[in-house]
Amino acid sequence: MTDQNWKESLNIPQKDTRPQTEDVLNTKGKTFEDFPLKRELLMGIFEAGFEKPSPVQEESIPMALAGRDILARAKNGTGKTASFVIPCLQQARPKVNKIQALILVPTRELALQTSQVVRTLGKHLGLQCMVTTGGTSLRDDILRLNDPVHVLVGTPGRVLDLASRKVADLSECPLFVMDEADKMLSREFKGIIEQILAFFPTTRQSLLFSATFPLAVKSFMDQHLTKPYEINLMDELTLRGISQFYAFVEEKQKLHCLNTLFSKLQINQAIIFCNSTNRVELLAKKITELGYSCYYSHAKMPQHARNKVFHEFRQGKVRVLVCSDLLTRGIDIQAVNVVINFDFPKTAETYLHRIGRSGRFGHLGLAINLMSWNDRYNLYKIEQELGTEIKPIPATIDKSLYVAENEAAVPRPFKIDQLPKGNETVHKKSGYEYKGQPEVSSNVAGMPQQVPNGPVPPQQVNPSQGNQMPPQQYPGYPPQYQQQMPPQFNGYPPQQQYASPQYQQPQPQSQQQQFQ
């Protein structure tokens, strides 16, 4: 293989032709070959489908290779992971059997994803990457560390445990990386991070990446980073390329609204967020009863089950994933083009990370928020903090806002009637999934009756139905929030205060149960 034809032997995947937003396309025109990278590393980069560096990669990779500490702020889904993985792989030496880079992340799923990126980009380098997280066998991790490990990816608690037992030797580790630094320096992890740093040499290089930088990050920077190179590619926190809508929906109407969205939207893959683990499992079951294959994941599940869900969802074996905020941090599944907040989040930070699961790497995405009347205060607060606008949901959502023109390039998950033979089970719960054709039932509160051909179509509702309350002014809130007082939930809700009546379904007065 000569210098001229070394690219010809690479197994380069098909080019992704989906449109991208300017925060990914607005680069300085550099290529990965402009950086002082090993040929073997470049081979892994190109075979992973990388074409040219994103803005955050253009800014961070040269400075990291120069040995500078880095504090980088960029929006979700713009290539932050490769921004620190590439310098780690470039600086690691395969013949030195010591840990040469530690990458800390807040969740187990993100650790698995990051380790996979390390292995993919570094597959020609002869480096060994190990992932270690809580919920897995400590004994197995200890045995694995008897073999050479060059890059260690893990969650803080397990890494501290291994370092304290003197199994993971960090005394000569030159590179310390924190992804999702805002979460890592919260009260939950900050003390652990400080203890881990005590095992490092004083001359280490530190790389911090995040979408938001609270005061805790600045305090950590002042204490532990040496003249850091600061990168800020977020003049505002608005997630470009993601269209955001809301609908005021009574609790018992949410499931029908979700069913209507399924019938109206063109979904490659969708993530649906709930605010509690109990609601995650119950919603997953009811989505299955609507006739859709569905996985769910939350923090109380066994680690092996979470791993399997995450892996199979990434592989496109299912269209819908219901989860708690477990998957809001850094998870990169580019086939996800729709995020639905079944429960509206309480904080702007949570909202930002949730909807950032769509529109990855500058591609188009759609975020829909199902809101109760009391959520309107949080809606206004989040809009103000993020400098964004969340619009009322229209009767028809333009597909060009979230669907790629070349759909053949996007993996298409299965629906129930498309599942491979052998998956036709009835409400079979295996700890983490609901798959198969459901039994027909019309007795579930808030759910439309099933028919042989699938869920019933959305129904138009007469806006005149329901109890009307006089308008109530809320000082300090814009006019669109100064609508009517919450309805008396004793019949049909007044449809004027809900966006798009076709997303509502009338309920008999006797049906007072709510989705709990």
From Swiss-Prot:
It catalyses: ATP + H2O = ADP + phosphate + H(+). GO terms for biological process: mRNA processing; mRNA transport; regulation of translation. Residues 1-22, 436-516 are annotated as: Disordered. SUPFAM superfamilies: P-loop containing nucleoside triphosphate hydrolases. Residues 461-471, 479-516 have a biased composition (Low complexity). One of its GO terms (molecular function) is RNA helicase activity. The keyword Hydrolase applies. ATP-dependent RNA helicase involved in mRNA turnover, and more specifically in mRNA decapping by activating the decapping enzyme DCP1. Is involved in G1/S DNA-damage checkpoint recovery, probably through the regulation of the translational status of a subset of mRNAs. May also have a role in translation and mRNA nuclear export. One of its GO terms (cellular component) is P-body. Residues 1-14 have a biased composition (Polar residues). This is ATP-dependent RNA helicase DHH1. Its main location: cytoplasm.
